[in-house]
Regions:
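Short, well-structured N-terminal submotif of metal-dependent ribonuclease cores
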Residues: 1-45, 55-72, 144-147
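Active-site neighborhoods of divalent-metal-dependent phosphate/nucleic-acid chemistry enzymes
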Residues: 2-11, 78-125
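Residue-level recognition of specific faces of alpha-helices
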Residues: 34, 47, 69, 76, ...
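Short, polar loop motifs at secondary-structure junctions
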Residues: 27, 125-128
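Residues at the C-termini of beta-strands that transition into short coil/loop
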Residues: 47, 83, 126, 142-145
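Generic structural signal for small/hydrophobic residues in well-ordered secondary structure
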Residues: 17-18, 53, 90, 115, ...
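Alpha-helix capping/helix-boundary segments
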Residues: 20-21, 49, 86, 128-129
Length: 147
């Protein structure tokens, strides 16, 4: 149903990877401009990304400030959870990559699995990293959007 809706209405839905959110929080102008450019598009993130952000906040020098930024982010984005379908896709992807002698971090594979299951375009600066996953749609918002 989700794929049909996207085709009918031409809506692209996005899943922000951890690096894209970090670029935004650090004031990257291109990422911030893309967020504004896509303000009317559904933009989501994954619970795994939040885990990585919390880890980074707690190991940082500015724990309180970084935690506050994450709390604000949680309120402004829909958070995709890891469901049974994503778990199965994760296992399949990890197996396929290992058979070809390639590996990706488990968290990255889970994020990719969530994007695939929910038919979301993964917004990341790690395009080389994720392009090994067949069928995964990618976007890089560290480049300025075309008007």
């Amino acid at each position: 149903m989700l794929q049909i809706n996207q085709r009918l209405y031409g809506v692209t839905m996005y899943l922000l990877d951890t690096d894209t959110i970090i670029f935004s929080l650090k004031g990257n102008a291109a990422v911030q401009k893309n967020l504004l450019f896509h303000i009317n598009d559904p933009i989501k993130t994954c619970v795994i990304t939040l885990m990585e952000l919390y880890y980074g906040a707690y190991k940082s020098q500015k724990v309180t400030g970084n935690l506050a930024k994450i709390k604000t982010l949680e309120q402004s984005l829909e958070i995709i959870t890891v469901g049974v379908e994503s778990v199965e896709i994760f296992g399949m992807l990890k197996s396929q990559l290992e058979k070809t002698g390639s590996r990706l971090d488990d968290f990255d594979l889970i994020i990719a699995a969530c994007a695939l299951v929910h038919n979301l375009t993964l917004v990341t600066n790690n395009e080389k990293h994720f392009q090994r996953i067949e069928g995964l749609k990618l976007a890089n918002w560290t480049c300025y959007p075309e008007a």
